[in-house]
């Protein structure tokens, strides 16, 4: 059974989503199913079928969240240190071609948000960076082609 590394913030966000789905969405959907059922013939009842589909999607997501949370390996990034890139590190890179700086934090899969500078530990960027140190050059294979970066800084915050 694989563990999912995640930050305490990532765990909290998934836990909040699980609670919302269990305590708000589930009762709302059950009520919608009951109301649609009261309209009679279920074979041609679009409201009923839509509510049942919503129930299926919600219950599937609940099961997925419960699984991820049960297998979460919470890593408190503030207790990490060093100059080697690992899970939780905030890495400052410079594109060796354009001199453009980028800052990424390496987080768990469910926490990733590239626009917010949070890349999944399983992403090509993170896989290329893991184990590298300040001053190292890395080649990252992106969908747009290969990129060369130099690591300027590694921080844990």
Swiss-Prot record:
MF terms from GO for this chain are:
DNA binding; RNA polymerase binding
Q: Where is this region: Disordered?
A: 1-24
Residues forming coiled coils: 53-73
| Pfam families the UniProt entry points to | GreA_GreB, GreA_GreB_N
Residue spans crossing the bilayer: none
List UniProt keywords, sorted A-Z. Coiled coil, DNA-binding, Transcription, Transcription regulation
Q: Which NCBIfam families has this protein been placed in?
A: greA, PRK00226.1-2, PRK00226.1-4, PRK00226.1-5
Q: HAMAP family this protein is in?
A: GreA_GreB (MF_00105)
Q: Which family does it belong to?
A: Belongs to the GreA/GreB family.
The task this protein performs is described as: Necessary for efficient RNA polymerase transcription elongation past template-encoded arresting sites. The arresting sites in DNA have the property of trapping a certain fraction of elongating RNA polymerases that pass through, resulting in locked ternary complexes. Cleavage of the nascent transcript by cleavage factors such as GreA or GreB allows the resumption of elongation from the new 3'terminus. GreA releases sequences of 2 to 3 nucleotides.
**PANTHER family registered for this protein in UniProt:** TRANSCRIPTION ELONGATION FACTOR GREA (PTHR30437:SF4)
By what name is this protein known? Answer: Transcription elongation factor GreA
């Amino acid at each position: 059974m694989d563990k999912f590394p995640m930050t305490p913030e990532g765990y909290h966000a998934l836990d909040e989503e699980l609670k919302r789905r269990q305590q708000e969405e589930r009762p709302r959907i059950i009520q919608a199913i009951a109301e649609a059922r009261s309209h009679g013939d279920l074979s041609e009842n679009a409201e009923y079928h839509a509510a049942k589909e919503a129930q299926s999607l919600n219950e599937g997501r609940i099961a997925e969240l419960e699984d991820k949370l049960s297998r979460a390996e919470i890593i408190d990034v503030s207790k990490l240190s060093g100059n080697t890139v690992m899970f939780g590190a905030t890495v400052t890179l410079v594109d060796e071609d354009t001199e453009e700086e980028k800052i990424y934090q390496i987080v768990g899969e469910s926490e990733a948000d590239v626009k917010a500078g949070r890349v999944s530990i399983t992403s090509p960027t993170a896989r290329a960076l893991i184990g590298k140190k300040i001053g190292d050059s890395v080649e990252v294979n992106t969908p747009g082609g290969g990129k060369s970066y130099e690591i300027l800084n590694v921080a844990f915050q």
